[in-house]
Amino acid sequence: MKTYIFKHSLLGVILGLSILGCTEGDKFDYNKNMAFITGTETTPVTKFVVEDTPSSYAVTASTTDKVDKDVNVKFAIDRSLVETYNNEHNTKYYAIPEGAVTLEDADAVIQAGKAFSTPATVKVISTEDFAEGRVYVVPVTMVEVDGLEILKPSKTIFLQISRVIHFTSLNISNTN
């Protein structure tokens, strides 16, 4: 009988403490509208397949809710972010060489009533200066968003260049 009372008393105390522990609530503002780069919700690194040059990749900004008025978004390529990313994540990416990439339509707009922007276009125009064996990335970041706060972990997308290599090989599977 004593163990029955002890077990139920202990269970009651644990239940009471767990309820009291949740009364503070979290400090996160669920109604706050923030901007982020589309596709960075799970990882900031995204593959960008470059088969021939020029190759294009559309980068857009999204918001956590629809906007009431037009919001201007400014994108930029910031090569210095590659070293920062490498240090934080223990990776060995290389910034794409100067002159190998351009950013078109860097000034995008999230139109009123929508939650995504017009695209900025990243265009790889040359792979001539690429060294064999290196993994290159293009760090595209949101520099400025009018009237909205930028979600820091999703501020930059790293476009990992994946090159398609064509080669011929001997087919030894034919037994004729």
Segments and roles (model prediction):
Residues 18-21:
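C-terminal motif of bacterial Sec signal peptides marking the signal peptidase cleavage site
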Residues 23-104, 108-111, 115-119, 129-139, ...:
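Acidic/polar, low-complexity intrinsically disordered N-terminal segments immediately downstream
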Residues 126:
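Residues on the solvent-exposed faces and adjacent turns
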Residues 1-10:
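Bacterial N-terminal signal peptides that target proteins for export
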